A protein has these predicted regions:
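Secreted, disulfide-rich extracellular signaling modules
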Residues: 1-197
Length: 197
């Protein structure tokens, strides 16, 4: 079985603690929950891969449209930990397909002044322009529900096919800490929808 590796064309981390801060060109992606001054804080990250690159791999190596044969395949999301601190006995990381477009921006964590020219916890793109939708989503789409933390993206939680469109990995402090998620259902649905299959 051949292995094809692709890298994201854009990514960014969203922070509740810094609701308008953009981190689009920061080298680190962060997923965490923590307390700051007795307030719960969250960070999550967005990753986008080239649809053209995904479709090319699918069309060239997985699916044959002439014979309607689809080869056995799987898609995995791999992220490698730079630093891990404060792990609970068990920690769970979940991945969902994002619903809607977003702008990566050019910010880095800790820029002073704060960079706001891309997505953040509150905004999908340049700060002050378009907020993440908080209601009236499309079918199978949701977002954060906490009133104090409005924002943080919108994502798919299901599909008309009934396939599970999320992935998760549970870590404990003795496990390897690199992320390795099976995102086959997410990718197959994404490809089929992008091609109107």
């Amino acid at each position: 079985m051949a292995i094809y590796k692709i890298t994201p064309e854009k990514d960014a981390t969203l922070y509740t603690e810094y609701p308008s801060m953009n981190t689009g060109i920061d080298a680190i992606l962060e997923a965490s929950t923590y307390l700051k001054d007795s307030n719960a804080q969250t960070s999550r990250y967005l990753i986008k891969f080239s649809q053209t690159e995904i479709n090319n791999i699918f069309d060239t190596h997985i699916s044959n449209s002439t014979t309607n044969v689809v080869r056995n395949h799987s898609f995995c999301l791999r992220n490698y930990a730079a630093t891990v601190t404060g792990l609970n006995k068990d920690s769970k990381l979940e991945a969902y397909a994002i619903s809607g477009s977003w702008d990566m921006g050019t910010g880095r964590f800790g820029n002073d002044p704060e960079t706001t020219n891309g997505c953040s916890w509150v905004f999908t793109d340049e700060s002050g322009s378009v907020k993440w939708k908080q209601s009236n989503w499309a079918t199978f789409v949701t977002a954060s529900f906490e009133d104090k933390l409005k924002g943080g993206g919108t994502w798919f939680t299901g599909s008309a096919t009934g396939l599970v469109v999320s992935a998760s990995q549970t870590f404990n402090y003795t496990d390897p800490i690199d992320l390795n998620l099976d995102v086959t259902n997410i990718c197959n649905l994404w490809v089929s929808q992008s091609k109107s299959i």
